[in-house]
Structure formats: structure tokens, C-alpha cells
């Protein structure tokens, strides 16, 4: 996949504005209808004050919002957080709405609008995360909701590093048994680091954890942004689904190419050759 440069989507839609004192017992809840016109790739922004040193989490349906960081630690001069809508995130927002959680800060505004291109059904997370000295990006486990790992060959971690001489560790937990790969076992390019899933049971690896962690050390070069976590589908899975959908107008298939009568659960589906996220 070739990631396109960030682009501005004209217009912004205000979702909520006011002053809400957020703490763990006083969540700010936004109804699903407020996100009816939101699109994949749109940027969702939560503005706040008095949050320096605090932690903010974005939830939906009582759990973490897919496609987001596990927690946002707020810097002294920071007045907002922004996330970019993956298909899974959008599905949750439009069905369950948004819950802004955290410890002792004032939420002031929520809106969505200008965003990024290059986000599709295989995008688990997209955004900008600064990698410096042993920085760790933690994305929520349910960012992979609906994924059939039997049809995924690798995970690509895109960045703006423009080089390969940095340290990267991909982990599900700290300590023994949590490391999935590093720069010595992954394919390193100037555009991305790729973790092959050959020999890795991702379903089992994620079963008893709540996040996937990407840790980097810039080494001798400059710090850089991580920009996207993308799944790589096996060619056989894509070809198999395409062949079936060419013959079946509005038939519904799972991402693995199995025909179903209707959509019974959340996940990725294909109708008439086009992928979409079932709610």
C-alpha cells in the first residue's frame, strides 16, 4: 500500500461545546447520531483545559474506541487530542457514540473534519505519534476487531523516519513472551517496518492482553513520527474473494471469502467486490 500525504477535507462539524468536568466517575458521553455524517479518514478532535499531566481515554460501548491509543498522557502545553477515523472506529462511533474519560480535566469542545487519505479496511490505526528515545505507541486491541488473522500475512508500521537504522520492538506485553519482533527480524524500509506473521499466532498473542505496543529508539538519527499501522492481506485471500464477488451481484462474503446470508456480527465484509465494516 502507498500512503498518500495528509490532505485537508474541507469543512468541520461541531459535535459538542461547553464545559464538562471529566473524571472517572463523570464521563462525557456523546450520542451516536452526532457522528452520522462522519467519514473514514476524518479527524476527530477533543479540546480541553486544565489537563496537564493527566490521562485521557476515548471509549465507546463501554470499552476502548477502536483505532485509538490506549491512553493519551497530556503535556503541559497541550490543549487537544486528535484521532483519525478507521472503518472500525467509525462503525463504533455511529452505533454507540463516544465516551471521553479520564482524570480531573475540563472538556470544552468536540468536532470532526479535515483528515487523512490512505485509510482503508486494513488500517488498524492512523495518526501522528512522536518517536524519540524509547517512546512507546500503545494501540487498543479492538483496533483489530473483525480481523481474520488466517488471511493476514504481515503488519506494516509506517513512519516518517526515512531510514532503517532505528530500534523497533513490537510487543503485546512487557516481559517474557510478549515480544513479536524487532528490527533484526522485521523487514525494514525507509517507509515502513514490516512484521511477518509467519509462525506468529496473532489471535493467541492478543487473547489475554488489551493492547499492541510499538516501541522505538531513534538511535543516532532524528526523532520521527509514526503515522499508520496497516495489515497486509495474503494475495490468495484477496484473489479468492474477488473471483467469487465477480459472479455474485449483491452476495455477502466475509473477508476470508466465505459466503453468508446476512451480517451477524461486527467485522469486515465484501459485497459486489467492495469491502465494508459490518455493524
Enumerate the language-model features and the residues they cover.
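Sec-dependent, cleavable N-terminal signal peptides
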Residues: 1-12
